[in-house]
């Protein structure tokens, strides 16, 4: 089965944002001491329930979109309920701070144990995540220490340092929700990132 069938129209973006916002509001199973993959799975289960029962368009959500080219996989993908399981939105989840650290982050840039790029925004810019023709992508952050304000300053300072041509995260009308605009590294064009930050600093 072909799993890289993508709808580039971006016409479902508002429904997807609704699903994510509502899913985060129902985040009763998320906590700081859980592994990132378990918190992500809990969110995905909620996103999927909302997408197939509460939206005009049937939109599913699953973990780990496997690419046919084997270059990488996103933590979360949203898809249409059609014969091709058409992908319409990708999202990457990151812990703040990085696992087993107090202040490091891989939200903007980073290196994996095999010296490959591991930063969330970085991987979208390189085309490892997302698709150059799909101009809207997502990031979720699980805030486990410090305040949202402190992490916002850290992340925006890193964007300014590493990618001065890109915009910082800008607060929307929704709490802990941001947008930013980025250029691609290897080809022309820009894309918008939708950021959803979930404060788990007071949970156990």
Which residues fall in each region the model found?
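Non-catalytic C-terminal interaction segments of nucleic acid-processing enzymes
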Residues: 156-204
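Acidic, metal/cofactor-coordinating or nucleic-acid-engaging core segments within structured domains
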Residues: 102-176
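Acidic-basic catalytic patches of nuclease active cores, encompassing PD-(D/E)XK
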Residues: 6-62
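Conserved catalytic cores of phosphodiester-cleaving nucleases, focusing on short active-site segments
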Residues: 76, 89-97, 124
């Amino acid at each position: 089965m072909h799993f890289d069938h993508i709808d580039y129209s971006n016409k479902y973006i508002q429904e997807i944002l609704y699903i994510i916002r509502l899913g985060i509001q129902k985040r009763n199973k998320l906590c700081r001491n859980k592994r990132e993959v378990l918190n992500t799975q809990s969110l995905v289960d909620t996103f999927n329930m909302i997408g197939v029962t509460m939206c005009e368009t049937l939109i599913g959500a699953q973990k780990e979109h496997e690419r046919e080219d084997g270059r990488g996989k996103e933590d979360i993908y949203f898809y249409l309920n059609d014969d091709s399981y058409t992908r319409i939105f990708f999202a990457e989840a990151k812990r703040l701070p990085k696992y087993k650290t107090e202040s490091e982050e891989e939200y903007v840039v980073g290196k994996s144990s095999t010296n490959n790029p591991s930063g969330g925004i970085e991987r979208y810019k390189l085309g490892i995540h997302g698709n150059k023709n799909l101009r809207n992508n997502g990031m979720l952050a699980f805030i486990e220490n410090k305040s949202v304000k402190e992490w916002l300053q850290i992340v925006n300072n890193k964007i300014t340092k590493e990618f001065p041509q890109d915009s910082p995260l800008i607060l929307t009308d929704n709490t802990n929700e941001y947008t930013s605009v980025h250029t691609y590294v290897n080809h022309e064009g820009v894309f918008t990132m939708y950021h959803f930050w979930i404060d788990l600093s007071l949970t156990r």
